[in-house]
Amino acid sequence: HQRKWPGFKDQSNYIVSLANYEWILFMDADEIISPELYLEIQSHLNSNSNNWDGFYFPRKTRYLGSWINHGEWYPAYDLLLYKKDKGKWVKEPHATLELDGKAKYLKSDCLHYTYRNLSHQLGTIDKYTDMSAIEMEKEGVGSLTFQLLFRPLFRFIKGYFFKRGFLDGVPGLVAAITTSFYVFMKYAKLWELRIKNQPQIGTDESAYK
């Protein structure tokens, strides 16, 4: 099936509509089910008492040569297994599953082999913050002064100190900083987007080419 790219949300819902079975396992190409998670899933699905409509997986990320065990990155629970008629993907650019039913949090990890290196991560941040800024503009996000100043700082403090990202050494520090940087850039790009949409006097855009 080939079609024009409609965005992450619509594409996700379209893909799910093609499935023929009751349960949907929706994972990215860089995610793997650990043997322990496989057995846990099988145990629940084969149980006669199973009355769940979806399952959250704790996602453990491989980053800069180490497994991240703390901070905002772990456990990063994702609703990845659900009944087809109970779920709908919403939001952009990070499509989120909206479940009409009950979900259970599993204990075993889904393994996430993320960025190849920091250059790969920064490129991904650049791409997704572009899309995030556009979506926030559509949603009418208000004053940006507070967002630019405090949201990135709060995210760093939350991930590195409150959620003990410091226990993961240098990779934990870099993860906390780049998460904070992502937040800063999406609001900075929203500000830039609004400036570009305002009438400019005496500016020759060709000078930047």
Predicted regions and their residues:
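Catalytic metal- and UDP-sugar-binding loop of GT-A-like glycosyltransferases, i.e.
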Residues: 3, 27-29
